[in-house]
Amino acid sequence: MSQRGRATRPTGPTGRPRRTGGQRSAGRVSRGGDLASRRARLHEVVEPVVGEAGYDLEELSISRAGRRHVVQVIVDADGGIDLDAVADVSRAVSAALDAAEEARGDIVAGEYQLEVSSPGVSRPLTLPRHWRRNAGRLVRVTVRGGPDAGDRQLTGRVVEADDEQVVLETDAGRAGWSYAELGPGRVQVEFTRPGETDGADGADEAGDFDDDDDVEGEER
């Protein structure tokens, strides 16, 4: 589902954006900066809003798309996040960006598209909370070898995970691995998981094929 809206700017008689203080000063233009500095300013605004809503900011990116920017915000929580929650976060982030621009000037120079979503199945598991939130899923991961052994690939089901290690069930049995021993994990798509009947959770599994489970977009 994608819900789109448009935020309007004050315009003059010609329909172009009204300049409230003559030509933009060199200092104001420099606030646009490069993508890295814009991302840093966005992070300052967005992360507190997402945290206050009770979610984790998993990723924040900004890129060019023609004549506008695309701001992508990925959020998650224990138990996942549904479309209604994504929409709530999208509105809160949009309002915070509006307020920040009123107070501090352009956060993102020019028009931009705001996209808020939950992580898709393609998101690599790099933090303890990523592994914890994927308990029960089949994961493929690289096990780092020691000085006398090379890396190897391992496929196993996530049994449990804490801040120190993850326990995986493999064909060889159950074993715990510290995160330092593992590379990023990759969730493997399954049509039927153990303990599920065919078709019982088909609607849930269909979402595994999307890069983002739920997306809320707003054009600005």
Swiss-Prot record:
Top-level division of the source organism's lineage: Bacteria
Biased amino acid composition, Low complexity: 1-15
Keywords: Cytoplasm, Ribosome biogenesis
Cytoplasm as UniProt keyword: yes
Pfam family name, one: RimP_N
Subcellular location: Cytoplasm
GO CC annotation, single: cytosol
Disordered: region residues: 1-35, 184-220
Database matches in PANTHER family: RIBOSOME MATURATION FACTOR RIMP
UniProt name for this protein: Ribosome maturation factor RimP
Source organism of the structure: Salinispora tropica (strain ATCC BAA-916 / DSM 44818 / JCM 13857 / NBRC 105044 / CNB-440)
Name of the gene: rimP
